[in-house]
């Protein structure tokens, strides 16, 4: 799953570990390093390209001919059929990534963005977050020492709000755990039909070794041609040196890259060297007849070597990904435990001025940290969607202002966006400035909306949170 033999995924960690605000209580911990979120845009685009290449691998002879642009008159030896089975497994893995891992990773980023904006608020719509409301409820508890009813209500609201955040943190912890499990399946396979990258890697290397021996640079056929041309060159050089008045030209054109795919062109007019003319003609015939085979071998084995390099990269960086999502799982567990401790804070501790001030400061600092992480998570999600389907296209957003609860909508239900959105509304990202008249949306179980003809990217708004987000674009 690689673009070409010169393009490989960077060897450094696939997923960046994180150092911003890691000491903030109630904060996001190590979820970002300040300028990279989970996976950088460039790495995500590269992974997407690898996966798309994997989806297009040839699994029969006709597909192989199309893939490497071989005409029907060029024969393909039967031993190349070894590729089809291993490519089929690689293709299955790529399909599994798209169906299972890709949505989970996007969902994990959405979880972080959703939680971050929930606790920190969203300045773009002047919406207060849960931490600001917790601060207000703490003020009500401290400032209403003589009003038992007001204190009781503030405590009830405070604990209920903490309970919501604890519940979501546990859900997101479980989601990160599921990603770790899925990554392990992707890399090592399962008991069903997913073979696993490491097993594909092993089989691919075996096929690569066999085909390189039969058709690569060290194959007997290529060695024989190389030796003949080498001997011919020596003979020509010796003859030319002996005949100072000989006007000749020997041109070697290395057209086939790493293999000996050159053609010898000889201009011989002097009778002194006519005795080697037959040798030259014979070598030329052999080279001409072998050219198609050499071209075939270069293309197919070059593709094989490139994909083998890609598999190596995916496996090593997949292992790094497991470590990071294990860490993310631990971060969510810590966040849940910290807020659980906050929920069980005693009334006496809250009413103590020093303790109350300390909690207020901690919530304020954590809110600032969450806002940064939430914005980065949202940006990452948009980049991930755009690079997975169409790279380098601008994201324009159109939103409906209707309150629609159906799963299918037509273009006439859309108007200029509003800032106060309600549940069951939609936001659409695409490269056009208007929707076609016959536009129709359909929603799948992952809350992803598809329009196959135009490849629209859809973002779902529900329960006061965006499933995805972007800057508004007024149509």
UniProtKB/Swiss-Prot annotation:
Name of the gene encoding the protein in the UniProt record: cry6Aa
GO molecular-function terms, A-Z: toxin activity
Known function: Pore-forming toxin with nematicidal activity. In infected C.elegans, induces an increase in intracellular Ca(2+) resulting in necrosis of host intestinal cells. Also, induces the expression of aspartic protease asp-1.
Organism: Bacillus thuringiensis
Coiled-coil segments: none
Gene Ontology biological process: killing of cells of another organism; sporulation resulting in formation of a cellular spore
Disulfide bond sites: 88-451, 402-404
Location of the protein in the cell: Secreted; Host cell membrane
Assembly and binders: Interacts with C.elegans aspartic protease asp-1; the interaction prevents Cry6Aa proteolysis by host gut proteases.
Lineage top rank: taxon: Bacteria
Name of the protein in its database record: Pesticidal crystal protein Cry6Aa
